[in-house]
Amino acid sequence: MAYQHGITVLEQATSLTAPIEGDSAIQVVFGTAPINLAEDPYSATNVPIIAYSYAEAVKQLGFSYDFKKYTLCQSIYASFQLYAVAPVIFVNVLDPKKHKKQNAASTVPVENMQATVQVDGILADTVSVKKDTESGTALKVNTDYVTEFDSNGHLVITLTATGAGKDAKSLSVTSTSIDPTAVTAADVVGGYNASTGAETGMELVRQIYPKFG
């Protein structure tokens, strides 16, 4: 029989607490979310979204610890991270086509072929990137650079090795951001548009049971 001498370490995978799934009194939460970080920012407004896990909610709505600006994130954190309660139905009323603001051009230094834009709420599809200065060479997304968001929700621009910006020392970046401060109480309350048949805000509560049963 073999004996071990000295200090040994045993590592075990962190166990995950299974969420408590309810079939009655399910939360329906109305508010704002950082949908610029969502998988599809333009399909996450005034539509009931059901989530059974933190990952699922973040994928569909994005996430930020700035709970004052993004009120749905407080419920995402409390329900899935603190108390493991699922499912939760979310309705985001922040509309990226309506609640937005234009950001001034900013010069961002490049380090190791990457530049991080320290601006909140950027909609990735609105970004315009030029090499070095505002009058410099315009770069093409997915050809000269690719984008992603870091853990702080800031846009990271990565230059490609064969792109036109590969030797850039800085980038001039313009963009549009979502603006949660533009959301009003009227947006949350919502209503019914008789001409289009569209429902918004809390009026959508009528769709919850027919949609999710």
Name what the model sees in each region.
Residues 1-213:
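Surface-exposed assembly/interface segments
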